[in-house]
């Protein structure tokens, strides 16, 4: 089957379309139209702060690892103590909580002759020190504590504080234990804010105390060192991923190199230089060996404080900047120079850092020592401190204080792995520079690899570590694999993405904030224009640019310096573009007088300035005038300097910009091209064409084809942000974009802007291609769009455009409970306890013990009973003893002597039909994640939940009773993001009716949470809050955004004719599954 694929990538969505085509490429049938909505990897409990699941789970994982390793370390210490014949007694078993401090002071002060007493007290002291052992430089080995340094600054500060607080002199040789015992124990606060030990002590301070104790207790040197080893034992997770490093495809026995390594940084510069070409008289030539080495040396050794510029590279080569091309070509590693030449990023990052000791060390270190430092700073490499250069790195780290170490953690070096090993990179770099060849030729000469060969790319769905990107990769991978399995390989895959589609949500919000600030600034300028210039109506964007340019230029013509105003000025492109269109960037547009604009015409300013006789026109004078320009309102001075510098570069350019072609609409985003290369390699054997374009292309295509005015969404025709189906529609439109069409769309967009700036008649609509081939391709494309619009109209009308999300069925989904730890309520066991009190029991065992008491009544609970006696987990509890109850009615968990609320940490909800009444009733059991932990290796949706679980205790009473009597039938389960098809005719609230009156009947709803034991939270599946307009009815915001529709479970399932829809990757309804995947079911 022949079909085209379109993929539209957004921040929280991926539009996917598969369209069957005939032999002529005309669309004949839609195979799959899916708007896949995802969470961009955000933690559901941290959406406001845009913290990802990856970040949250990383914190939780590191915390668990910290506790796990501490527990293991203390267990090893206990075993060591037992091997010495000393007893291990829990510190809590001593009646005096300050006893360990007194023992430590005693051991350091005098010899204890009784061997048994000495052994017990040594055990107490070592176990106490090991639990509060201070900080050590993570790069210093434990053996460095055998001969500890003198007192740390923190130790000295604590000594002075104790001297002041106690009023007693503190000997210079006092240990930590001895200093503490000088305080009034029990009256002064020891730890925490305001405590005498609030300063962070070093492990060397505690090692000195152990050294003094061992000396006083006559412990030999060998045993002393063993004690130091076991008390201060530490593990580092650094390098734990080194075993998973990929191999070099050219030398499979070697690991792929770090991108922060010197070998890769030099290779990257050499490879990108190899892509450069010089344009001479319409021909292109490669750089000579001498030219390549000149440029390479300049970029590698560029002063860190100086920014790299292509203009400087052109000057080194003795050419005009416009003659230098090939600056945006991508290498095998997905590296692209783009706006600036490549530099040694590792060197610049370190030297530009504000970590003075590191900068000084780096400048004097050898290449091998710098290499060892990069490995040490990388979490992915194992430290090599045994080599001579590694030892120097360790020595450097050992001399740093903890403040500098904190700064080191914030140092950002280039991340990721190169495609090749360091040896391969060095050899390829040497070959490219010595022979003056490009990467492909160097690879052929060095390894005998054909130029057409490319390094193997990861599979489409392989994670990259960015949660938002990983969501996109997984979605695209699953959909393409299913499509290929169903219909074969596609003929074309066209990918389009918005700027925020391949960045984190946090970064997307930052960019959105910048856009809002610019919009507010522009709105203020628009108002200023209307007031000062008496402009009628809202000024255009072109008017705003002209107004800003005139103000910025001190009301002077940028070319000759003569006075201009907003009304008599004209906008001109400093450097015109070859062919149709212009470069419509701010740095290439200036306000000029009519005389200069007419005289210059379609010529670069630098060329025209040499030949014109107009007074004041020269490159030198134009550059001088920019020095006096006024900074734009709201623009930072540093940004304005960069802007004027870019304008100066344009003034000096003597060649035209390159003609617009299909590449003008291609994406330059690294991750977009990474996705393209993965998809291309996946379909390499099928000859599938794969392209990736910038997000603006779809909007241009919709407008140019007229398809926007033909498709009706919920809120009318045209672009819709309210209707989530537009993502799939955009994907369908992009699927039929060819290189010729993309090029024509780019030119039309460019002409539109140019003509607006020049105040010319809008003739851009008439442009359909630069030559006969382009115009023919345009006509065919318009025909395809006509047929496609008919297909899409039918699909929208018949509700065949799918909006779906992945549902999370695994056990872990966000935090298991809230962070705040509260105090348990304590009541006497003999007290009267209501049923609600008993349901607040702090453990399942306590709940069971109370409900199994002879006097328990399911309605009244337990009466007061001074003789009551129960057993909880083998422990006898008597009437006078306290029992712990949760002080809140919400689901909670006992934790660290207190409790934490479980919040909305539900894994799923089970729907039951209760048959004990006159007519069937429906109820819901919300299942907490914690109640499923014992069953993680079983079917989580069918395991039996006992009455004592928090899930059962939080359920409606009618459901608990029905389950107890066997009158509840388990129908099926729901999870967040499940799709429900609902007939709202009998159950719609006034708010839902108001929304349906404005937008039409809403059949498809999304489960957005389990609001209460008896209510769901639903939102319209196909609608997004982003599209809610200010003039919309208030009910629209309440139903789509907050709080959503909160229908009672019984009413919804009794009168809503509900179907729970489950779909496969292509959006098709799944009615059965041999793989035990979730299937569609109907509530009846």
UniProtKB/Swiss-Prot annotation:
Can you tell me which residues form the catalytic site? Answer: 8 (for ruvc-like nuclease domain), 573 (proton acceptor for hnh nuclease domain)
Pfam family, any one: Cas9_b_hairpin
Q: Name one GO biological process term.
A: defense response to virus
Application in biotech and industry reads: The simplicity of the Cas9-gRNAs RNA-directed DNA endonuclease activity may be used to target and modify a DNA sequence of interest; this enzyme has been tested in human cells but is not highly efficient.
Look at the named UniProt entry and state the broad enzyme category this protein falls under.
hydrolase
Fill in the subunit field for this protein. Monomer. Binds crRNA and tracrRNA.
The keyword Nucleotide-binding appears for this protein = no
Q: How is the cofactor bound?
A: Endonuclease activity on target dsDNA requires Mg(2+).
Q: Name one GO molecular function term.
A: DNA binding
Which keywords does UniProt give here? Antiviral defense, DNA-binding, Endonuclease, Hydrolase, Magnesium, Manganese, Metal-binding, Nuclease, RNA-binding
Residues that, per the record, bind Mn(2+) 1? 8, 496, 500
Which SMART domains does its entry note?
Answer: HNHc
Sum up the protein's function in the record's words: CRISPR (clustered regularly interspaced short palindromic repeat) is an adaptive immune system that provides protection against mobile genetic elements (viruses, transposable elements and conjugative plasmids). CRISPR clusters contain spacers, sequences complementary to antecedent mobile elements, and target invading nucleic acids. CRISPR clusters are transcribed and processed into CRISPR RNA (crRNA). In type II CRISPR systems correct processing of pre-crRNA requires a trans-encoded small RNA (tracrRNA), endogenous ribonuclease 3 (rnc) and this protein.
Query: Required co-factor?
Result: Mg(2+)
What Enzyme Commission number(s) apply to this enzyme?
3.1.-.-
Q: Member of which family?
A: Belongs to the CRISPR-associated protein Cas9 family. Subtype II-C subfamily.
Q: Which amino acids does the record list as binding Mn(2+) 2?
A: 8, 500, 727
Outline the extent of the HNH Cas9-type domain: 504-665
Q: Return the domain comment text from this UniProt entry.
A: Has 2 endonuclease domains. The discontinuous RuvC-like domain cleaves the target DNA noncomplementary to crRNA while the HNH nuclease domain cleaves the target DNA complementary to crRNA.
Its recorded name reads: CRISPR-associated endonuclease Cas9
User: Which organism was this protein described from?
Assistant: Corynebacterium diphtheriae (strain ATCC 700971 / NCTC 13129 / Biotype gravis)
Tell me which domain of life the UniProt entry assigns to the organism this sequence originates from.
Bacteria
